[in-house]
Amino acid sequence: MIVVHHEDTLLQDLGGGNTRRILAWNDDLMLVEVGFDSGTVGATHSHVHTQSSFVLSGRFKYTIEDETVEIGPGDSVIVPSGKLHGTVCIEAGKLLDVFTPARQDFITRT
């Protein structure tokens, strides 16, 4: 069993009004809270990981390839591996992102 207490996690300032907090992970799965100020952007990108984003709070325009939808609290999207995707925050909020396999590039080794 892996248990991660919130007080043991690190809030990372990504700049530009965005934050990231890795909540839990193993090699197969990663859970990440991503914060956005209103008007900030999650730049369009792709990766080999399958990703699901669940809206904890706020409103977002979420784009996968050439399709854009507006999502809010309780909504979720699934991004298949290798697909271009990004978001624009239209009301300050947080996403809960799940990646499989885990994003090793997010993990800071000390």
Task: Name what the model sees in each region.
Residues 81-105:
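Ligand-binding loop in jelly-roll beta-barrel domains
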Residues 47-49, 75-76:
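Amphipathic, hydrophobic secondary-structure cores in small proteins
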Residues 49-60, 65:
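Glycine- and acidic-residue-biased ligand/ion/polar-headgroup-sensing regions
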Residues 1-28, 108-109:
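A short, N-terminal "cap"/entry segment at the start of jelly-roll beta-barrel domains
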Residues 56-57, 72-73, 91:
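A cytosolic small-molecule/anion-sensing beta-strand core signal
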Residues 66-81:
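Short acidic-glycine-tyrosine-enriched beta hairpin
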Residues 41-42, 61, 77, 81-86:
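Histidine-centered metal-chelating micro-motifs
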Residues 32-46:
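Conserved short histidine dyad/triad with adjacent acidic residue
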